[in-house]
């Protein structure tokens, strides 16, 4: 417990919080160029081939970003938009690629949760009366 005089001299130091996505530098999104597209296996007890891409961001940092959804159109040298968000069973993957932005198409045929996967609403034919 500090004395009153110590508080007058030094004050209280507030704790600094460590960010979970440092490469974004406090921005909600960063654009980048895709360098490599690959598949990785998750931690135990899960089993799959998760799609990730190595992306060089506009601030010259290189990060691994997860490609969400079924099927994707991400290729090498594509321009992508990256947001924060960890993948729980992939160590070292702290970012997500935003589908439907820049060179990346949204997931086709998606009916629920469309905004997360860059899918457009299916057009219903207008009926005449």
From Swiss-Prot:
Keywords, alphabetical: Ribonucleoprotein, Ribosomal protein, RNA-binding, rRNA-binding, tRNA-binding
Region called Disordered, residue ranges: 110-129
Database matches in InterPro entries: NA-bd_OB-fold (IPR012340), Ribosomal_uS12 (IPR006032), Ribosomal_uS12_bac (IPR005679)
Residues in coiled coil: none
GO molecular function: rRNA binding; structural constituent of ribosome; tRNA binding
Assembly mode: Part of the 30S ribosomal subunit. Contacts proteins S8 and S17. May interact with IF1 in the 30S initiation complex.
Protein name: Small ribosomal subunit protein uS12
């Amino acid at each position: 417990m500090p004395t009153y005089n110590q508080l007058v001299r030094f004050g209280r130091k507030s704790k600094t919080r460590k960010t979970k996505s440092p490469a974004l530098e406090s921005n909600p999104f960063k654009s980048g160029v895709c360098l490599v597209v690959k598949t990785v296996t998750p931690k135990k007890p899960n089993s799959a081939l998760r799609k990730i891409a190595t992306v060089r961001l506009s601030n010259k940092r290189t990060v691994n970003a997860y490609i969400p959804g079924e099927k994707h159109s991400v290729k090498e040298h594509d321009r992508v938009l990256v947001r924060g968000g960890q993948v729980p069973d992939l160590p070292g993957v702290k970012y997500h690629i935003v589908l439907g932005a820049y060179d990346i198409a949204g997931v086709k045929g998606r009916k629920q949760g469309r905004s997360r996967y860059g899918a457009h609403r299916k057009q219903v034919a207008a009926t005449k009366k």
